């Protein structure tokens, strides 16, 4: 969410050509709805992940994406943090929403594991460099 917030709310789009988001909670996560006070105290940002949080309402006023920035969203079907997984996609024109498993069939990578997985990191580099990424669906 921080990257989307920077680009839109802090005028960061003037400084960014390509943005790659990993498993973003742009539409919230059902885990944030868990009425577990201990979780909220441990994870202060979890309240912002609630689908109806003030942060998400502010971010989603109008388009999330900004003109002039190429957006890619990388998602793993194995995510157990931002659920349902489809909530991670930005459903706006020009956004390339990608399941890692569409590029790497059978790939087992978790939400946090995306940060350490060399094949995922290679995909990020290609996207940042503007290289074409072909999925089974395009």
Where are these regions (language model features)?
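Lipid deacylating catalytic domains
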Residues: 1-138
């Amino acid at each position: 969410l921080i990257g989307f917030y920077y680009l839109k709310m802090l005028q960061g789009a003037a400084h960014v050509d390509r943005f790659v988001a990993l498993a973003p909670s742009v539409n919230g996560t059902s885990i944030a709805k868990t009425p577990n006070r201990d979780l909220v105290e441990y994870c202060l940002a979890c309240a912002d992940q609630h689908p109806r949080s003030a942060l998400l309402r502010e971010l989603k006023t109008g388009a999330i994406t900004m003109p002039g920035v190429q957006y890619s969203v990388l998602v793993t079907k194995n995510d157990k943090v931002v659920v349902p997984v489809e909530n991670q996609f930005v459903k706006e024109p020009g956004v390339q929403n990608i399941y890692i498993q569409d590029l790497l069939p059978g790939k087992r990578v978790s939400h946090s594991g995306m940060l350490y997985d060399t094949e995922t990191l290679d995909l990020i580099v290609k996207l940042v460099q503007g290289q074409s990424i072909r999925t089974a669906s395009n």
